[in-house]
Amino acid sequence: MFKIFKTLYFLTSFIFLFNYELSASPTNENNFHAVKEYLKNLNTLEASFIQISNDGDIKRGKIFFNLPGKLRIDYIEPDNLLITSNGFWLTVQNKKLKQTNNIPLERTPLNLFLNKKFNFEDNSNIKFKIENDVITLTFFEDQKASKFELEFNSNPLRLRKWVIIDEFENKTSVMLQNIEMDVKLSNKIFIPDFYDEKSD
């Protein structure tokens, strides 16, 4: 159970309340505006991912989302986790053990991202940085809490990675590969593969 929720934490601490620190540079302002528009217009995505934890553990899989609300994160063997969302519930399943845990999506930070509840006008908890053509948005609740980073290639602008940094500065990176955007996705892939009566 701990392993399931550790993985869930890494992949669903996706968006915190926003605050950005931005210089007066027109280039920075233009890039920040471009990132806001990118996230605003992000609807469907399909990609492979490689997840690397602080201890070097590597997991692989596929991720799909159809905003607002729908998500599928499917780990490949030897990991047997499947995470889906229908916009109301986040379902975490161990396919090998046939275990299912349902969590209200609104109780997870992922709700802000999946339901596109962005509030870039609240300037309290986001940092914006450009370095070597990489744009990084860092989201945090306070300086001592966990942080979540989104990394983008700046030219062309494209989401390439997110990083979770816990309160002990342990990092888990999720790198996206073979990204396809604005693809047509069947609603069936966002339905859990099986059900049982166990839920949180």
Language-model features: where?
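An acidic-aromatic
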Residues: I63-N111, T172
